[in-house]
A protein has these predicted regions:
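Short beta-strand segments enriched in small/hydrophobic residues
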Residues: 19-24, 55-69, 76, 170, ...
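Periplasmic-binding protein-like
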Residues: 114-122, 180-182, 214, 235-245, ...
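Hinge/beta->alpha junction and helix N-cap segments in small-molecule ligand-binding domains
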Residues: 35, 65-75, 93-102, 145, ...
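Flexible loop/turn connectors
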Residues: 227-230, 234-334
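Short acidic capping loops at alpha-helix termini that bridge into adjacent secondary structure
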Residues: 177-178, 209-213, 263-268
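Alpha-helical recognition/docking segments in bacterial nutrient-uptake
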Residues: 1-3, 59-169, 173, 233
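N-terminal helix-turn-helix DNA-binding module of bacterial transcription factors
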Residues: 1-58, 332-334
Length: 334
């Protein structure tokens, strides 16, 4: 009997299950109850079980989005692909279906596929999921985590707070004092950080933050359109709007057009991301650039280096920069 077979037999006895059940758990197959799966995984941990190297690695990185439907996703894919190709690997995409936390079926599939590393975008991983991935030697990195990641969760992001500061200072330097803000999802750390940085810059300049002109969207163009109309139809509409991403900023541009306003003569608009579409909007969009491709590349390298046993920083934040185009100008006299 081989050493691995004997080990599986010992684990099966400890967990009071059959060796085939242990095999199902190791390979992420269905047909095992949650309670039994937990019992087997506890036995695996207590025995210090490590699957054979040829079963641990497949030459690809799994890149996980809530949904792959935007230029934002394309930029991240480019970065991850660059890192993968440099290591002789490919990239597999999967979706969690508009959920920050991947479900158990996704986790089972990842265990079956055995990628060399996993990069999750806008995600929170529960402790049980982290343990299952670690048990199978699958390193993971969260890119732009939805919440504040635990110290043991490697993550990559951009300097979101500083990006908010840069957007606010630009509008303040142009002379704007009545500014609306459309943040991204309020439960996402990056959204809150951008709004917090923006507000801090206003406080520093002694300019009141308009709580009545703050809205929260879902990073969608439709949100920018709807919430932009709300802000622009206030009794005292803002002279400028900072949107938490470029897609919502494009929605604000459309809202202004629908209300007969000209950008930037009647309204200044600042976005966030610097997607390619920002250069071709009408007018070209002033925005805060976060290096999405570089973020994807760094996240992939973190995961692959962890697979190779290298130890790197658990948190990487890349710098943002303001890109001034034609959607901002000094406020017109009213």
């Amino acid at each position: 009997m081989s050493k691995s077979a004997a080990t599986l037999t010992h684990i099966a006895r400890t967990a009071e299950v059959s060796p085939s059940t242990v095999s199902k758990v190791l390979n992420g197959r269905s047909g095992v109850s949650a309670a039994t799966r937990e019992r087997v995984e506890q036995a695996l941990r207590s025995h210090g079980y490590s699957p054979p190297a040829e079963r641990r690695r497949q030459p690809f990185i799994e890149l996980v989005f809530e949904r792959v439907d935007s230029s934002f996703a394309i930029e991240i894919i480019r970065g991850v692909q660059s890192a993968a190709v440099a290591r002789g690997m490919s990239v597999v995409l999967s979706e969690t279906g508009n959920r920050h936390t991947p479900g158990p079926e996704w986790l089972n599939q990842v265990v079956r596929r055995r990628p060399s590393g996993v990069v999750l975008v806008f995600s929170d991983l529960p402790a049980a999921a982290k343990e299952r991935l670690a048990l199978r030697g699958i390193p993971f990195v969260v890119l732009d985590p939805a919440g504040d990641p635990a110290p043991d969760v490697p993550s990559v992001g951009s300097a979101n707070w500083s990006g908010g500061v840069q957007a606010a200072r630009h509008l303040l330097e142009l002379g704007h004092r009545s500014i609306g803000v459309i943040g991204g999802p309020q439960d996402m750390m990056c959204s809150r950080a951008r709004v917090s940085g923006f507000r801090a810059a206003l406080d520093e300049a002694g300019v009141p933050f308009r709580a009545d002109a703050l809205r929260w969207g879902n990073f969608l163009r439709e949100d920018g359109l709807r919430l932009g109309r709300e802000l622009l139809q206030l009794p005292d509409p803002p002279t400028a709007i900072f949107a938490g991403n470029d897609l919502m900023a494009l929605g604000v541009l459309e809202a202004a057009r629908m209300l007969g306003l000209t950008v930037p003569r009647d309204l200044s608009v600042v976005g966030y991301d610097d997607l390619e579409i920002a250069r071709w909007s009408g007018p070209p969009l002033t925005t805060v650039r976060q290096p999405l491709a570089e973020m994807g590349e760094q996240a992939a390298l973190l995961a692959l280096d962890a697979q190779d046993g290298a130890v790197r920083a658990a948190r990487v934040d890349l710098a943002t920069s303001l890109v001034v185009r034609e959607s901002t100008a000094p406020p017109s006299a009213r």
